[in-house]
Amino acid sequence: MKKILLCCNAGMSTSLLVQKMQKDAAARGLEVTIEARPLNEAMDHLDDASIVLLGPQIGYAKGDFETACAGKNIPVDVIPMADYGRMSAAKIIDGALAKIG
């Protein structure tokens, strides 16, 4: 099972997105778990992640996450502002799964 880890400043805004993503994944029968963590906790939850998606408001932290994930073969990406703002769950899931491979 693949795990998508979303990260934002406090975990609040992404929690709504996670709910939409979970609903979309279930409707499509995808074997994926999706969870949100605030920035100050996310680094402690990388080991079982298949991909880390950062909210656009913390895109500045991408380099730090790439460094932390480098030896673990975990891709890191920033969710595009338009997709994040529109809560485009399916588009975000599809992008994440494409990067995971």
Annotate the PLM regions.
Residues 46-51:
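Short acidic/histidine-rich motifs immediately flanking catalytic phosphotransfer sites
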Residues 10, 57-59:
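Short glycine-rich anion-binding loops that position phosphate/pyrophosphate groups of nucleotides
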Residues 2-39:
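Conserved active-site segments centered on acidic
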Residues 25-30, 70-74, 101:
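Short helix-capping segments at alpha-helix termini
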Residues 38-42, 61:
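Short acidic active-site motifs
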Residues 61-83:
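A short, gly/pro- and small-residue-rich
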Residues 19, 23, 67, 94, ...:
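Short, well-ordered alpha-helices that flank and scaffold nucleotide-derived cofactor binding pockets
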Residues 3, 75-101:
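Ser/Thr/Gly-rich flexible loops in soluble cytosolic domains mediating phosphotransfer, phosphorylation
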